[in-house]
């Protein structure tokens, strides 16, 4: 028997919420689940580690990148099982979106995820009809 995918999604949402709230120091709400990859089944009873980190902050929204690991109890070895990308928005007491602090990526992985976040956001906005494809400069640069 394996961990139910919906249970893992809920755990990832909680971890992403904590990460977004810590970064913004505000109440945050889930806007979207942009990507989920169920790469490896998680057997029931496994030690599951959900790591959530703000990969990029925009004006009021934050992209949260999640890595999920199965940890061997005896050796401590970790095997990556899943990953996901969520978007959260910080809100005030009335539920109105508020600005969030920017992110300064440090590591190579952080810089990679930071740069990719803008492309993912532009793609999402183009697909939703909220951004003209000609204005998606970072996204267009991939095809030049």
Task: Tell where the protein language model's regions lie, with residue ranges.
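Short strand-loop-strand
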Residues: 1, 20, 95
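A conserved, well-ordered hydrophobic junction motif at loop->secondary-structure transitions
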Residues: 1-10, 141-144
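Active-site helix/loop of acyl-thioester processing domains in fatty-acid/polyketide metabolism
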Residues: 7-25
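HotDog/MaoC-like acyl-thioester-processing domains
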Residues: 43-47, 55-144
């Amino acid at each position: 028997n394996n961990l139910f995918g919906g249970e893992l999604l809920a755990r990832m949402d909680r971890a992403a919420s904590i990460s977004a709230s810590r970064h913004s120091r505000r109440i945050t709400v889930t806007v979207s689940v942009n990507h989920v990859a169920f790469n490896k089944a998680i057997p029931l009873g496994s030690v599951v580690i959900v790591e959530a980190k703000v990969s990029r902050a925009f004006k009021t929204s934050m992209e949260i990148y999640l890595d999920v690991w199965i940890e061997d109890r005896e050796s401590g070895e970790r095997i990556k099982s899943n990953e996901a990308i969520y978007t959260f928005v910080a809100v005030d007491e009335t539920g109105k979106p508020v600005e969030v602090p920017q992110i300064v990526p440090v590591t190579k992985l952080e810089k990679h995820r930071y740069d990719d976040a803008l492309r993912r956001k532009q793609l999402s906005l183009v697909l939703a009809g909220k951004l003209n494809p000609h204005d998606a400069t970072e996204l267009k640069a991939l095809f030049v």
